[in-house]
């Protein structure tokens, strides 16, 4: 079972060094409130540590991932993702099976950009951020690693 990291960009590109913008581009996080899912590997964690003042991340649970796919993921044509689209294009029975295969590491969301519009675009969080985006999550801020609390933030941003 692969651990999936949900990564959300929370700060813009202005006054950011070029290497930060380049790393965010590699993670496909071009704009504020874009999100992507990646497996937890040492390479991804190294990139996240480099850009931590601009993103927040944590382990996403299957329920939140399913909600994210249903509500915010778009097909390449701009329509909402449905069971019939997943069955037609990916040859997977339904969205539940797709989520299961994402967690088993059989398919990767970041490699399916020919079928879906990636990255996934989110709204700003309902009720606003609880802390400052200029401080780390551990010090009553918002950026950096937040573990399972990423699920709560993603649900507020859908």
Curated annotation (Swiss-Prot):
The keyword Membrane does not apply. Signal peptide: none annotated. This is Large ribosomal subunit protein uL30. It comes from Saccharolobus islandicus (strain Y.G.57.14 / Yellowstone #1) (Sulfolobus islandicus). It comes from the Archaea. CDD domains: Ribosomal_L7_archeal_euk (cd01657). GO terms for cellular component: cytosolic large ribosomal subunit. Pfam families: Ribosomal_L30 (PF00327). Keywords: Ribonucleoprotein, Ribosomal protein.
